[in-house]
Amino acid sequence: MKPSLIIVTFIVVFMAISCVAADDEQETWIEKRGDCLPHLKRCKENNDCCSKKCKRRGTNPEKRCR
């Protein structure tokens, strides 16, 4: 009975670690994709933009790409 309990515990721990690793991988992929969305391309904090043409829009201090 105890060996089967150890095996089940090992499987559950392995699955939990796999799920956490998959979430980290997905976040890394999203970061690599970039900060710019296709429909609303935002400038980065250092004013570097996907289209390299940043301009202020309206009274909002946040800059956006055009």
From Swiss-Prot:
Record InterPro entries = Scorpion_calcine
Propeptide residue interval(s): 23-31
Q: Which UniProt keywords apply?
A: Calcium channel impairing toxin, Cleavage on pair of basic residues, Disulfide bond, Ion channel impairing toxin, Knottin, Neurotoxin, Ryanodine-sensitive calcium-release channel impairing toxin, Secreted, Signal, Toxin
* A Pfam family annotated for this UniProt entry: Toxin_27
Taxonomic superkingdom: Eukaryota
**Disulphide connectivity of cysteines:** 36-50, 43-54, 49-65
Q: Which GO terms describe its cellular component?
A: extracellular region
Q: Where is this site: Essential for stimulation of [3H]ryanodine binding to RYR1?
A: 64, 66
Q: In which tissues is it expressed?
A: Expressed by the venom gland.
May I ask which residue range the UniProt record assigns to the signal sequence?
1-22
Localization: Secreted
Chief place of localization = secreted
Q: What SUPFAM superfamilies does this protein map onto?
A: omega toxin-like (SSF57059)
**The UniProt record lists the keyword Disulfide bond:** yes
Which portions of the sequence form the region Essential for stimulation of [3H]ryanodine binding to RYR1?
A: 55-57
GO MF? calcium channel inhibitor activity; toxin activity
Q: Describe the family membership recorded for this protein in Swiss-Prot or TrEMBL.
A: Belongs to the scorpion calcin family.
Describe its function.
This toxin stabilizes ryanodine receptor 1 (RyR1) opening in a long-lasting subconductance state (35% of the full conductance state). Furthermore, it triggers calcium release from sarcoplasmic vesicles (2 nM are enough to induce a sharp release, and 67% of the total calcium is released after toxin (100 nM) addition) probably by acting as a cell-penetrating peptide (CPP). In addition, it has been shown to dose-dependently stimulate ryanodine binding to RyR1 (EC(50)=0.3 nM).
Record note on domains = The presence of a 'disulfide through disulfide knot' structurally defines this protein as a knottin.
Protein's recorded name: Opicalcin-1
The organism is Opistophthalmus carinatus (African yellow leg scorpion)
